[in-house]
């Protein structure tokens, strides 16, 4: 019975962020209709010829619609408090999926692992009267930013699309899908890898047995939030390199030349955010270097297409 319960808990924790996005997607199905109606009211004029002020007005409404989407998702996240904070506080528990995985990896290679623990040596506290309420509000807003990210990208595309050729518009539609996918993969990477590694290392670090770790709730949530969002942005590297290559800022030769430097930077970052064992550092470094190599391939592809256009 205990084994069955453990398997279920593992699946539950592993799927929590995915389930959250899935459920909120269906909750906000009417959101698209609402924003379309706002779009009809505010963007009915032809965009064939627009002055600078017209562009500013259009940008203002794109920002307003994006903000509305983020706030609506944030309100639902605020209502689903228990579910959201179950996700956030899961990495502080010793039976979190990632800790069990690293513990098994350590046993496989025959060395002791800091992840083989039932409970991390710290507690979370709120030291101000409005601390928990403030944390609830800001967590809901950031949940709105993460979940509504594809729609925000869509609004960005709608703003720049009038200036694009038809073939570039088709490419931009693919950009929204790929960029959203990369972002959510990065979010999951940050949640299941970077966050538990950071929480385990920082929460367990001690300069003296005399000092007990009593972490403020804002500090803990900040670590989770920064890990998740920063990884989501880092995973946009191929998209960023694509546009930088189109603009002539970056070339594949430049990226190949500084590949070793990039590897050193990645290893240093991995050494900072992971416990001092080689296995953890390698597991963190490999996906980031893989993204770098993919970005080199994309840069070469874009440069070749641009050169063919000139010819």
Stretches found by the model and what they are:
Residues 27-311:
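Membrane topogenic/interface segments and analogous intrinsically disordered interaction regions
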């Amino acid at each position: 019975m205990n084994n069955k319960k453990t398997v279920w808990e593992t699946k539950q924790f592993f799927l929590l962020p995915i389930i959250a996005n899935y459920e909120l997607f269906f909750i906000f199905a009417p959101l698209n209709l609402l924003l379309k109606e706002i779009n009809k009211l505010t963007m009915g004029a032809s965009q064939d010829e627009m002055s600078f002020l017209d562009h500013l007005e259009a940008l203002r409404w794109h920002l307003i619609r994006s903000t509305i989407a983020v706030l609506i998702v944030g309100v639902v996240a605020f209502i689903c408090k228990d579910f959201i904070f179950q996700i956030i506080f899961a990495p502080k528990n010793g039976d979190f999926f990632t800790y069990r995985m690293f513990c098994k990896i350590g046993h496989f290679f025959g060395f002791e692992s800091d992840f083989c623990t039932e409970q991390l040596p710290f507690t979370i506290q709120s030291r101000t009267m409005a601390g928990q309420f403030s944390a609830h509000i800001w967590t809901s807003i950031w949940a709105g930013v993460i979940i509504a990210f594809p729609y925000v990208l869509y609004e960005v595309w709608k703003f720049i699309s009038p200036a694009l050729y038809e073939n570039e518009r088709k490419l931009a539609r693919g950009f929204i899908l790929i960029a959203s996918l990369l972002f959510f993969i990065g979010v999951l990477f940050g949640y299941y890898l970077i966050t538990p590694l950071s929480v385990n290392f920082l929460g367990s670090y001690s300069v003296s047995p005399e000092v007990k770790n009593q972490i403020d709730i804002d500090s803990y949530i900040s670590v989770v939030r920064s890990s998740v969002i920063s990884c989501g942005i880092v995973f946009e590297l191929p998209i960023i390199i694509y546009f930088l290559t189109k603009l002539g800022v970056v070339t594949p030769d430049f990226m190949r030349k500084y590949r070793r430097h990039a590897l050193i930077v990645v290893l240093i970052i991995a050494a900072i955010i992971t416990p001092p064992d080689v296995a953890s550092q390698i597991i963190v470094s490999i996906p980031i270097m893989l993204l770098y190599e993919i970005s080199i391939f994309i840069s070469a592809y874009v440069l070749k297409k641009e050169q063919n256009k000139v010819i």
